[in-house]
């Protein structure tokens, strides 16, 4: 759905006024429409400024060809870096990640507290085991990348106030 900015703002404010919690979403399910980093960061800030608790980064059910993913489902690292650096506090975004390889990549690069959406029910236990370091396939990488994760976490904590 293409909603003009003023309509998105109106609907968020209306839902908040009715006592609902609000999540906004950016990105399109259409694989021909790619996310532009600067515009995506702008949309995240707009959603948060309008009162959304978090902003979801579209990833579809397939995790292929939309959002931060290429047609094979691999994370576009530069786009992810641009988003995280632009938003600064990645605790305010939820990244749709339906594939296990995407969970692992995001946990390794953004740390165990990254917010993931569109996780398949049969993947939840594996994902949570990975988050707490109980899976051998990502534990070593998490330890290697821990300084980067802590740096990103510290950046997000500094922006809390």
Model-derived segments and their meaning:
Residues 22-26, 55-57, 93-97, 114-118:
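Hydrophobic faces of well-ordered beta-strands that scaffold small-molecule active sites
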Residues 1-20, 34, 63-80, 102-104, ...:
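Active-site-adjacent beta->alpha loops and helix N-cap segments on the catalytic face
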Residues 25-39:
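Active-site mouth loops of central-metabolism enzymes
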Residues 1, 44, 50-64, 113-129, ...:
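Glycine-rich phosphate-binding active-site loops on the catalytic face of alpha/beta enzymes
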Residues 1-2, 26-29, 59-62, 98-99:
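Short, ordered loop/turn segments at secondary-structure junctions
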Residues 67-82, 109-113, 124-161:
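C-terminal helical cap(s) of enzyme catalytic domains, especially alpha/beta-barrels
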Residues 16-21, 50-53, 88, 108-115:
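Glycine-enriched alpha-helix->loop->beta-strand junction motifs that scaffold or abut catalytic
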Residues 35-48, 98-112:
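Catalytic cores of alpha/beta
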């Amino acid at each position: 759905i293409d909603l003009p900015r003023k309509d998105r703002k109106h609907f968020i404010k209306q839902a908040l006024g009715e006592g609902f919690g609000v999540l906004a979403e950016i990105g399109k399910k259409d694989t021909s429409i790619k996310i532009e980093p600067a515009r995506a960061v702008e949309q995240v800030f707009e959603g948060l400024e309008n009162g959304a608790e978090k902003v979801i980064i579209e990833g579809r059910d397939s995790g292929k060809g939309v959002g931060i993913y290429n047609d094979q489902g691999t994370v576009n690292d530069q786009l992810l870096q641009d988003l995280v650096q632009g938003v600064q506090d990645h605790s305010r975004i939820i990244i749709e990640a339906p594939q296990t390889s995407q969970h692992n990549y995001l946990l390794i690069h953004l740390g165990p507290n990254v917010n993931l959406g569109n996780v398949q029910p049969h993947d939840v236990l594996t994902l949570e085991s990975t988050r707490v370091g109980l899976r051998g396939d990502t534990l070593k990488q998490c330890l290697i990348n821990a300084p980067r994760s802590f740096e990103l976490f510290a950046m997000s904590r500094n922006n809390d106030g």
